[in-house]
């Protein structure tokens, strides 16, 4: 059975760990940086003889339309954009503490800019949090921390 996973290093590691947690594969120790061309080298045992195929992250949801593709491990942002809902969810990351954060960053010489301050203020409002909660329906959680 063909399964599509992300072809970038960090998301590929996440996908492989999900497949391992689901009991479909056993992994070797993963290196700090993964390569799509080496995906089979990361797998110690392929318990279900899966054809694990790395593709561009933004193409995984579309790969589900391929009758030869058994399943795909889709990031929440792309799943939502493709109209997938929790009804299609078969498994998810086992670690509830796993967090992928988006960071607003600027050059040091711009940190005191009024435009940057206005942007930070706009992005960290209760209105923005409500929009994220309503739009992403719990798949993305707003959490605002000012680091500097």
Please report, for each region that a protein language model flagged, where it lies by residue.
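Solvent-exposed loop/turn segments at secondary-structure junctions
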Residues: 9-12, 58-60, 77-81, 110-111
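Alpha-to-beta junction loops
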Residues: 1, 24, 47-50, 66-74
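Short loop->beta-strand "edge-of-pocket" segments that line small-molecule binding or catalytic clefts
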Residues: 1-12, 23-28
């Amino acid at each position: 059975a063909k399964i599509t996973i992300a072809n970038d290093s960090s998301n590929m590691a996440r996908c492989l760990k999900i497949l391992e947690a689901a009991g479909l594969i056993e992994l070797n120790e993963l290196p700090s940086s993964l390569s799509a061309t080496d995906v089979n080298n990361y797998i110690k045992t392929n318990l279900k003889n899966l054809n694990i195929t790395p593709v561009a992250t933004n193409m995984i949801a579309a790969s589900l339309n391929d009758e030869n593709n058994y399943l795909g491990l889709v990031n929440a942002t792309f799943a939502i954009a493709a109209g997938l809902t929790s009804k299609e969810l078969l498994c998810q990351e086992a670690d509830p503490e796993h967090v992928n954060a988006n960071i607003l960053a600027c050059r040091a010489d711009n940190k005191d800019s009024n435009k940057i301050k206005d942007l930070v203020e706009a992005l960290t409002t209760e209105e923005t949090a409500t929009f994220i909660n309503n739009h992403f329906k719990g798949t993305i959680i707003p959490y605002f921390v000012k680091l500097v």
